[in-house]
């Protein structure tokens, strides 16, 4: 049968990518359908119960700045919050939260069920309706045909998913859930490049059987950070500690003796695993000189005794897992509640996507999350939001939007994927961003909320909060610029204790704040009390003003390349001087801009210059554009 309603946007998958995609499209006014094989697992944290971390919290804050759900759900479900790299510069500071799985999932489901324009439907998707290279809808497992203007695929690890425990394996999207094999076969029949990746999870432990007295305690921060720009500490549930354990020589002996029973080392698994979250087998094998590896013992929630031992992800047989766990100090009597496993799944080469995450071969079809070769809740959620908003814009007849690399980590993530592709699960790090001094987690709202408002993603409450904050920053910045301190003033006398030498002349407060010895609180005696987030922003902008200005100049030069778009039908075979190899790379990637072409591995600056000359010859760009690029 045909579903009685037609939708603007259909989202397949209810994980972190799918939920953000559906919420984004619905916030923009599109009639949106979220298809999931099980409504009870919406927003499920399939791997570790944590949100944020280095590079990842930057994405979470950007999602939040654009009106997304992840940060708010984290504030409602977070049971431990910490700021990582707190003693380093603001560009690399990152908030990380341990989350209660049940509370987090409930928060996401609550937002979905209360979002206007959004319909939830428990049905697995088995097929796509494609006509004239354009997706028209979806066919469910029970044969229901649902029609829509745009479709977003957020299938996670479910496409052709195979779960491995030792040399035994079975089909599955994750533990306890079936795979999406019919949809995987349908996608393989379309002109996409497909490959396999793998990820894994550790055995879960019963806290009642763990000896915490011999483990290192890892408390959260006090005062507790918040994840959302609208977050409040009183939203947080009860806070708890995590703990740290360590593997040892005996643990490593057990693993080495059983590598022939590992599906990874016996050739059963062909997919590549995440480099930055390796299995314990990988760690012991690759880092044979290390006598010990850390294990972060993370509580799964406030109402359960289950623990997540982060650091011993494994696909070894259960009897070996049992020995490994019992060999660890503090785990000598530990009871395993669920065995660890590896899962192998299909992913599609993200170079087959545009910046909007729409596929190049099938119009109105968008991919987001692990289907694009990424790993991590945060990376998936960020892609989901972008794909959802662009699916909505496509349905509304509007042009696509995507942030540039200098505007957001989301821009870095997408540009890396669609330009270079990935041979292993892609994880975000601050080191991937060239302009990370501008892309801090503390200023994601200043970078993106105004854009989000224009796109229709940001509601009145968030906009009012943001506007108040932005105005307060401007007022305080102006006060610091206009206020002068005389050497004989009381403030100057108080500051002399913090400075190398007393002030010898008058200074503006703004100039004093640039000094490393002083912070905003030292200069705020006569000012109205400021929100800490406002004071932090004023201080960072003052202290890093010179560095930020230099980085902005560099960005302005790069933007000239970004502005030069390459025609979709550009025939690289007709461009004189390009090597056969470079022609092949450009033809395969089909870059959208001159700057993107320059970021393709193996495409030289000389080749970019040849592209520029060719465009000028074909009068595809104006002479002044070429002059601007060469300036």
UniProtKB/Swiss-Prot annotation:
Gene3D superfamilies: FAD/NAD(P)-binding domain, GidA associated domain, C-terminal subdomain, tRNA uridine 5-carboxymethylaminomethyl modification enzyme MnmG/GidA. NAD(+) binds at residues 273-287. GO terms for biological process: tRNA methylation; tRNA wobble uridine modification. FAD binds at residues 13-18. Keywords: Cytoplasm, FAD, Flavoprotein, NAD, tRNA processing. GO terms for cellular component: cytosol. Transmembrane segments: none annotated. Pfam families: GIDA, GIDA_C_1st, SAM_GIDA_C. Its cofactor is FAD. GO terms for molecular function: flavin adenine dinucleotide binding. InterPro entries: FAD/NAD-bd_sf, GIDA_C_N, MnmG, MnmG-rel, MnmG-rel_CS, MnmG_C, MnmG_C_subdom, MnmG_C_subdom_sf. It comes from the Bacteria. It is found in: Cytoplasm. Belongs to the MnmG family. NAD-binding protein involved in the addition of a carboxymethylaminomethyl (cmnm) group at the wobble position (U34) of certain tRNAs, forming tRNA-cmnm(5)s(2)U34. Homodimer. Heterotetramer of two MnmE and two MnmG subunits. This is tRNA uridine 5-carboxymethylaminomethyl modification enzyme MnmG. The gene is mnmG.
